[in-house]
């Protein structure tokens, strides 16, 4: 019994310089490498306040496996996190602690607002509820729903990763005054508040 002849290795001299460099080296810019490492290594800090948090923690179960996106390391301290996920109803008494937690996070930092209550106050158009968490901290991704499904949280992570991958942030950035960045724009909800409060009759079902 004879063995088949071994395939001779390709001599290095027969490869072009471009082929040899492509097999042995990785060429990129420091900004692209930093963005790639950041988007695949998110350290979330969960701030759950209501029923949306139940759907949020479901993403950590094996059924959805958030670890696939490099965001499974839940941090107990905001000083070790770079992603803040706000889910649930944000009351005015919780706004100051939430802002303090955000300011303790290391830069660069990102924020996901999960659910209708965190996005715009939801159905609680009352004095004690903040009408959107973006009133006092910048938000990168909004997740609609009441409550949103766990798949929506995964979609938000993918959207955030795409956003981080295209960013050209410096290695360190300090978020200061947000005036002029779109966070202080008037909301249609507030513009029509007087009109809603003046209504005394409900619309019939056929007009809804």
Swiss-Prot record:
Needed cofactors: [4Fe-4S] cluster
GO MF term (any one): iron ion binding
Protein name in UniProt: NADH-quinone oxidoreductase subunit B 1
Subcellular location: Cell inner membrane
PROSITE patterns xref list: COMPLEX1_20K
GO BP: any one term: aerobic respiration
Binding residues for [4Fe-4S] cluster: 51-52, 117, 146
Pfam families for this protein: Oxidored_q6
EC main group: translocase
Residue ranges, compositional bias (Basic and acidic residues): 185-197
A single cellular component GO annotation: respiratory chain complex I
Family named by the database record: Belongs to the complex I 20 kDa subunit family.
Name of the gene encoding the protein in the UniProt record: nuoB1
Reactions catalysed, as given in the entry: a quinone + NADH + 5 H(+)(in) = a quinol + NAD(+) + 4 H(+)(out)
Topology term for the membrane: Peripheral membrane protein
Organism whose genome encodes this protein: Rhodopseudomonas palustris (strain BisB5)
Annotated function: NDH-1 shuttles electrons from NADH, via FMN and iron-sulfur (Fe-S) centers, to quinones in the respiratory chain. The immediate electron acceptor for the enzyme in this species is believed to be ubiquinone. Couples the redox reaction to proton translocation (for every two electrons transferred, four hydrogen ions are translocated across the cytoplasmic membrane), and thus conserves the redox energy in a proton gradient.
Region feature Disordered, mapped onto this chain: 182-208
InterPro entries xref list: NADH_UbQ_OxRdtase-like_20kDa, NADH_UQ_OxRdtase_20Kd_su
Highest taxon of source: Bacteria
HAMAP family (alphabetical): NDH1_NuoB
Subunit relationships: NDH-1 is composed of 14 different subunits. Subunits NuoB, C, D, E, F, and G constitute the peripheral sector of the complex.
Known EC number: 7.1.1.-
Cofactor details (free text): Binds 1 [4Fe-4S] cluster.
Keywords from the named record: 4Fe-4S, Cell inner membrane, Cell membrane, Iron, Iron-sulfur, Membrane, Metal-binding, NAD, Quinone, Translocase, Transport, Ubiquinone
């Amino acid at each position: 019994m004879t063995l088949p002849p071994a395939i001779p290795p390709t001599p290095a001299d027969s490869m072009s310089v471009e082929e040899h460099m492509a097999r042995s080296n990785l060429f990129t810019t420091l900004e692209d490498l930093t963005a790639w490492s950041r988007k695949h290594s998110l350290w979330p800090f969960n701030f759950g306040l209501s029923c949306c948090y139940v759907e949020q923690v479901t993403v950590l179960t094996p059924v959805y496996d958030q670890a696939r996106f490099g965001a499974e390391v839940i941090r107990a301290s905001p000083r070790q996190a770079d992603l803040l996920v706000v889910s649930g109803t944000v009351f005015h008494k919780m706004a100051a602690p939430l802002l303090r937690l955000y300011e303790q996070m290391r830069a660069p930092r990102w924020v996901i607002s999960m659910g209708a209550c965190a996005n715009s106050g939801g159905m609680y158009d009352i004095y004690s509820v903040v009408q959107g968490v973006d009133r006092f901290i910048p938000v990168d991704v909004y997740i609609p729903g009441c409550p949103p499904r766990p798949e929506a949280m995964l979609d938000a992570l993918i959207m955030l990763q795409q956003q981080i991958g295209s960013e050209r942030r410096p290695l360190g950035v300090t978020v200061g005054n947000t005036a002029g960045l779109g966070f202080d724009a008037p909301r249609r909800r507030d513009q029509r508040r007087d009109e809603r409060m003046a209504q005394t009759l409900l619309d019939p079902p056929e007009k809804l």
